Amino acid sequence: MSQVLDDLVALLSLEPIEENLFRGRSQDLGFRQLFGGQVLGQSLSAASQTVEDARHVHSLHGYFLRPGDAGLPVVYQVDRVRDGGSFSTRRVTAIQKGQPIFTCSASFQYDEQGFEHQTSMPQIVGPENLPSELELMQQRAHLIPENMRDKMLCPKPIEFRPVTASDPYNPQPTEAVKYIWFRTDGSLPEVPAMHKYLMAYASDFNLLTTSLLPHGKTVWQKDMQVASLDHSLWFHGDLRADDWLLYAMDSPWAGNSRGFSRGSVYNRAGQLVASVSQEGLIRHRKDWA
């Protein structure tokens, strides 16, 4: 396991500070505020620590309420809403400076047999010969703002390999579809829950920007105000975040300064292991035009 991946695993392993209360460290990825994927992964970690191991998370639905401060820790308060015969429900509130910055509900279930079907995995080129996002970024290092360059070019705990690379500094309108392979930069412990925390963390990368593709816009442009508003994630079974996963994303709609994006995550065997949806703010700031 690389040092940056070890740091991420530690980030998602929260400190219990009281019954139903947990504290997590923060990381600065060079964004203007706390990365939403961190809060998603840590919220799931907090909820999972209040549920028996035999019940596995199958869904999480959350709202981003305020920008988080990447320089401060986050406190997670868990409400044990219900433990039923098959399902457990938890409500989690992420708090900074005494204010909620994120809230979500997560549902857990015992494994059981039932009807099964899934959509087929898209026929997409494999990841082996594709350049990573980091390699593509290094090729354009001179275009990255100097105050963000070190953060953008440092080693990453998760390797993303886009199937079709686009130029974030010279975007052109294109179809609102994106395919990206990803996996952690190294092997993970044999702890299924940690693989799901990392899936939640990774699911917030690249999804929102899919809704910008038809408009020839990126998050790097000064005339764009972009932020995640909500996030939903469904787990369809166990997954391995340290083996290649295909993130197939599209955006069927945008309007009223909001973009809606959805994603399907497949393993190399073609199994659908997770589904994602998100609505985000994609506001054109006319004062910069």
Predicted regions: what they are:
Residues M1-A289:
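Terminal targeting signals and extreme-terminal segments of soluble enzymes
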